[in-house]
Amino acid sequence: MAPLNFDLSSVPDRKSWCAQLVGRQTSRKIISTSEQFRFCSSIIYDEEYLSSRKISIVQYLLHFLMDISIFFLLLCLLQTLSLSSSNTLDNLRGTSLSVEKPSDKLVSENGEFSAGFFPVGDNAFCFAIWLNKSSTPTVIWMANRDEPVNGRGSVLSILADGQLILTNSLGITIWTTKAADLTSLEPEVTNLQLQLQNTGNLVLHNSKDVVIWQSFDSPSDTLLPQQALTMMSSLISRKGQDDYSSGNYKLFFDNDNVLHLLFQGPTMSSLYWPDPWLEDPGQAGRSMYNTSRRALLHDSGYFESSDHFQFNATDFGVVTHRRLTLDPDGNLRLYSLQKMNVSWDWVVTWQAFSDPCRIHGICGPNSLCSYDPVSGRRCSCLQGFKLKDQTDWSYGCEPEFSIPCNHTDESSFVLLAHAEFYGSDIFFYQNVTFQFCQEQCLNRCDCNGFQYNYNEGSGYYNCYPRYLLMSNEWTPITKFCWRFLFKTTKSRYFS
């Protein structure tokens, strides 16, 4: 078949005709008009040359436009690669981050925070946010801390209804945010974007910057500056320095509008901050009358709460980074990132407890807690008891003997002169004798000991039979008005 030939003599301006033709292929206007003219000038030249080569103008143009199409295809591929490596993912519907790709992570614009799959064990990962600047990465938030996923097939995705969803290799949902109501938004503004901000906040928002979800609303064990703790949120400690699963301690606003620390142990739970022996939180400077229940850490290191609790960091002022963390030992600490020689490390600039033995559950039931500023905290079992779990002191100690339930001569008591055990009172008897208190405990199968104390205010001796011996504090300072006796058998010998 003879090649098709266009008679260009009928076109008054060949360059304009060619520019229009190429312009249709370059609607994205990546190629300027002058460049279009140069392209056309390069192909509309000596017709005798084309005729001698038996090449029609149409064939030449088709070959030229094919080259242009390949160019645009390569350009689109480059743009896609650039998008996948940026710190934001645009139009995330159907887009995901994979645990199998270490490069699949979000990075804040300042480069100091990252969000992605963080290793928490052998073939175990959690979707997390961490700070890169410290000598070792510091995790500040986790989505699935209690249910890690394996290293194959797990992905974080954004669904069309505005949910973030984490699925494992079997497609089972491990973690998800609450579905957002996007029905009120116009279709053209429902394009979603997941962005890690310079504050460490991971935000899912639409094209009008309406926040659909943010990590600041659901903290793990850490608060960052400008991140509010509210009646809808809490801090939950991790189990250990290298165990990111939920631990035994919680910071939250209780129904009395006061910010509390709570111990949630295997066998019991108890409030331990503010001091539980205070009859009124007002004695600790707290107010129960502000119902807003909101606390905030400022960049300067100033912390304020709606219950009037407040403090300043020892290095008050602007520093590189701060974090308020409920640590695995139940102590609430404020840290600042400081340069130590060549590395950046965290330094404690405030803590709720200087004596860790005042923290409930730190040593578990049937144990004693002692603290020395030099050697630190030490847990030990009561004599005749043994550690229940060699890896976790929160389970406490268990007796190596059995106590008869009925009132017999086989039961006896051992005096602990400087120890105090908190909570778990069976009864409270005021202005009674020591013998009466002892008889009450002997007559009850669930009584494992009793506290017999002198109250200076009333001038009475009070009796507290207890069913659980949760250690609070042991001190070498003799407090003659403190006496605790725990039940044992006469056949046991205690030094």
Regions found by a protein language model. Give the residues of each.
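Classical eukaryotic N-terminal signal peptides for Sec-dependent ER targeting/secretion
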Residues: 1-15, 21-76
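Beta-rich ligand-binding surfaces for carbohydrates and other polyanions
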Residues: 59-495
